[in-house]
């Protein structure tokens, strides 16, 4: 996937954008997206989520794009919680509209899911605050912009590596085969020492934003 993501940056730079802090003269946010083909049927959104969106776009004969698929928004820690994420999503949707792609879809990575790695993602999605808004702040931000939670992308990101690599990445000893909860992961990883392999299969959440239309003055 790292190879394909490099192609996203190189071949779809028009869908890459930044948030800039004039006072500090530095980038404080980055957003990237990719055109995608989707027929509007919620059932056809792929379980592969993030990975599937890139694989489909770089297939030998990709289908003509009909929507814009968000791949990620990253905001500097000191600028989080100030409304920038909302503005970044809105800007992403505007860029899509400017290229004839009025609908934004997103395989969203829930911000707080890593605190509940043993909770099934479907159950996590049912958690709401007393005011009815979603417990997860990133899902909540998308919902406030009109997006619907459509389905779970159960295999959105798959990461494999040797046991040694996983011990390096997690800064943990993984002495035997089995399932481990590791820092930052939304779900546990699975270690197979006989095969010298660790696998992480991350679920994300497909969300669909309503078509963005131009408002006449």
Language-model segments: which ranges?
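Conserved acetyl-CoA-binding loop of GNAT-fold acetyltransferases
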Residues: 143-151
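Conserved beta-strand in the GNAT
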Residues: 18, 25-35, 69, 74, ...
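C-terminal/domain-terminus segments
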Residues: 4, 87-95, 99, 152-187, ...
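ATP phosphate-binding glycine-rich loop and adjacent ATP-lid/helix-beta elements
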Residues: 139
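Conserved acyl-donor/pantetheine-binding loop and adjacent beta-alpha core of acyl/acetyltransferases
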Residues: 31-72, 110-135, 153-197
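Conserved acetyl-CoA-binding loop-helix of GNAT-fold acetyltransferases
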Residues: 75, 81-98, 103-106
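Short, basic/aromatic recognition patches
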Residues: 1-7
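A short helix-loop-beta-strand connector motif used in the catalytic cores of GNAT acetyltransferases and
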Residues: 7-18, 36-42, 134, 198-205
């Amino acid at each position: 996937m790292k190879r394909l993501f490099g192609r996203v940056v190189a071949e779809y730079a028009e869908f890459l954008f930044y948030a800039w802090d004039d006072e500090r003269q530095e980038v404080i946010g980055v957003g990237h997206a990719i055109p995608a083909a989707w027929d509007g049927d919620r059932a056809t959104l792929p379980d592969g989520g993030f990975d599937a969106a890139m694989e489909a776009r770089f297939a030998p004969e990709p289908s003509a794009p009909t929507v814009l698929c968000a791949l990620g928004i990253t905001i500097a820690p000191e600028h989080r919680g100030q409304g920038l994420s909302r503005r970044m999503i809105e800007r992403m949707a505007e860029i899509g509209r400017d290229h004839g792609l009025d609908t934004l879809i997103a395989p969203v990575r829930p911000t707080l899911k890593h605190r509940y790695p043993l909770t099934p993602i479907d159950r996590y999605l049912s958690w709401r605050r007393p005011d009815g808004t979603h417990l997860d702040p990133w899902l909540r931000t998308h919902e406030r912009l009109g997006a619907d939670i459509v389905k779970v992308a159960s295999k959105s990101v798959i990461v494999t590596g040797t046991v040694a690599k996983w011990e390096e990445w997690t800064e943990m000893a993984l002495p035997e085969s089995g399932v481990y909860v590791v820092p930052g992961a939304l779900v546990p990883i699975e270690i197979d020492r006989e095969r010298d392999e660790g696998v992480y299969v991350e679920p994300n959440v497909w969300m669909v934003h309503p078509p963005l239309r131009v408002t006449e003055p």
